[in-house]
Amino acid sequence: MFKIGFKEHYRILHINNEMGNRLVGGAGTYMNEIYRYHKSDTGFIYMNMGGYLDDFDMEEYRETGDVAIMHMDESSKLANLDWDILVVQFYEFANCINDMVMQDRKLVYVIHSVPTTEPMLAGDPFGGNEGVRQKFEYLCNRADILVCVSNAEREKLIGIYPQYKDKIRVVHNGITFDEEITNNENYRKSRRVFGYIGRTDYRKGILECIQSIKDIDAELHIACPKNDSSYIEKILLYIEAANMQDRVKFHGWCVGERKKNFLNSLDALIIPSLYEPFGYVALEGMMYGLPLISSNNGGLDEILEGYRYKYDPYSKDGLKNAILAFRQDSNSEIEQQQKILRENLKKFHAKDMSEKYCLIWEELING
């Protein structure tokens, strides 16, 4: 175990597998925001779940302090650390949680996603993934409190496990943003440069997005890592068959300044997800003043309340019609929609999120 200003005792101890610059998705963004506003009674363990890492760059963490790094093989050391509440973010951490570790201490499971198939199969929501189901159920049963990141995810969880209803709390994710947001006005000159940023996963709806612009005079710019090689191959085969090589462009994974430049180059950001438990990508687009064209499934509908350019991802031509509406609307209509996005963003500040979690800690400790 490698410690960076790690104290002898913490009231709250978060275990995570995404932190600093070691990010994959929304759970990592969440963790960095929790770290940004954490108090001195809160510690963090970055759990390395892959191969051993020989070197650790302290600059990967936003500040120096209250961080320990360990490999999953060392997780038994959690039993000897002094903490009151353990907070886990991922069902794979079920392997770390047992009586020896817990010792009658409190456990909170922050459910960033109920790990079902999409669409969810009736009678088999986990699609036969028994290992995933068992780990998820184990943590849910063991936890004193379950936190869902949207009302949609709460309802999804209760639909599968009604017995958990009384111990579920909802805390929407949050992000840190400038109070003054400048509208991206690329759409005044062009409404044909669209972008997608995120993982390559069938649930993200990338293929459906490409299919939707096939008959529209538009480009799609994709910023993504290579998470699923078979899905990428399927996408590439469609692009070739549809003769869209000059209109669909891959930029690789974009972070930092590259991400900023990528988002600023777009006329609108498309979020074609079949389902999103929350939807951090929407908040990021809103931070840059971008018009969004988004599915309305899951937490996205809560983020984009009252917004025009939303669609049902399972409706025929839903995304295509939303794109066409964006292209045909007046500049003043789009400005009005950007105003709605700016107002909605104010509901999701990370500092507010952090304060809501503090209320949960007090509830657990003081009853």
Regions found by a protein language model. Give the residues of each.
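Carbohydrate-associated surface elements
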Residues: 152, 174
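Short hydrophobic beta-strand element within catalytic cores of glycosyltransferases
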Residues: 291-294
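Membrane-proximal helix-turn-helix segments that form the acceptor-binding/catalytic region
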Residues: 127-146
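Short His-centered aromatic/hydrophobic patch
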Residues: 88-93, 111
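Glycosyltransferase donor-sugar binding loop
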Residues: 46-52, 175, 197, 219-236, ...
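A conserved mid-protein helix/loop that constitutes part of the nucleotide-sugar donor-binding site
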Residues: 26-33, 192, 199-215, 233
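Aromatic "clamp/platform" in nucleotide-sugar-dependent glycosyltransferases that forms part
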Residues: 274
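Conserved acidic donor-binding segment of nucleotide-sugar-dependent glycosyltransferases
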Residues: 308-317, 324-331
